[in-house]
Every structure is written in C-alpha cells, then in structure tokens.
Amino acid sequence: LLSSAASDVYKRQVKKINKCLDNKTNSIISIFSGRMADVGKDPVPIIKKAVQMTNKKNKVEILWASVREPYNYIQAKQLGCQIITMPPKIIEKVSNFGKSFDRLTKDTVIAFLKDSRKSRFRI
C-alpha cells in the first residue's frame, strides 16, 4: 500500500496545483494511477483526496490516467473522476460489464477455439 510519506507528496502536489487554479480557467489534474499501481501503490486514496480538494472549483477536473484493468474504470467513476484514459483493450473489456460469467466464459472458449484452429496446432 501507499506509504504515508508518498501519499503526502501526492496530496501536497494536488494542493499546490489547486491553489494556483481559479474558477475561470478549465484545468485538468492528471494522476497516473496505473503507474502507482504498477509499483504496488494503491491510487484510490490519492484520487479520492484529489477529488475532495478540487470539488469546490467547478473548472478543475481530475483525470485517472494509465488505466491498467477494467475495474479501474469503476473505481474512477465511483471516486468522481471526470476524465478516464483507457487503452482500446481495456475499453473492449469494459464492454463486458453486465455480461453473465457463463456468457463471458463461453465467448472466451469460442475465441480460443478460433485462434487454435488458425494456428493449425492440434489439441
């Protein structure tokens, strides 16, 4: 989990940036949540705090950058991120939300079967 020292650095950065912004200029604070997660840091507390710190400025938006897994989309929405950047493969997986587990499993097996036939390997 994110150490309190590292967490404080992120919070201080957002606080400093937020102080510099006014209510007249559209602004985006981009937080590279995926990179935090890549090194074992939980980005959720930082994003939550950033949204809280900036919520009084209606022209400031928080961006959850570097989504690594589909569930990050849900986390970002729940925390109030206004912008979420996702690679195409993650967008495709998000489109599976709401599918039954059985349907997703069947679709995966069918895709695997198609790929294995294309490879001409025998299974």
Give the location of each predicted region.
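Structural preference for beta-strand elements that scaffold enzyme active sites
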Residues: 4, 26-30, 59-63, 82-83
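Catalytic cores of alpha/beta
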Residues: 11-20, 69-81
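Single conserved hydrophobic/aromatic residue that forms the stacking wall/gate
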Residues: 1-6, 10
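Short loop-to-alpha-helix "cap/lid" segments that border enzyme active sites
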Residues: 28-29, 39-58
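C-terminal helical cap(s) of enzyme catalytic domains, especially alpha/beta-barrels
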Residues: 93-122
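Glycine- and other small-residue-rich loops at beta-strand/loop junctions that grip anionic moieties
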Residues: 7, 39, 62-65, 101
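Bacterial c-di-GMP phosphodiesterase catalytic domain signature
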Residues: 13-38
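Active-site beta-loop-alpha junctions enriched in small/polar residues
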Residues: 8, 32-36, 65-73, 89-91
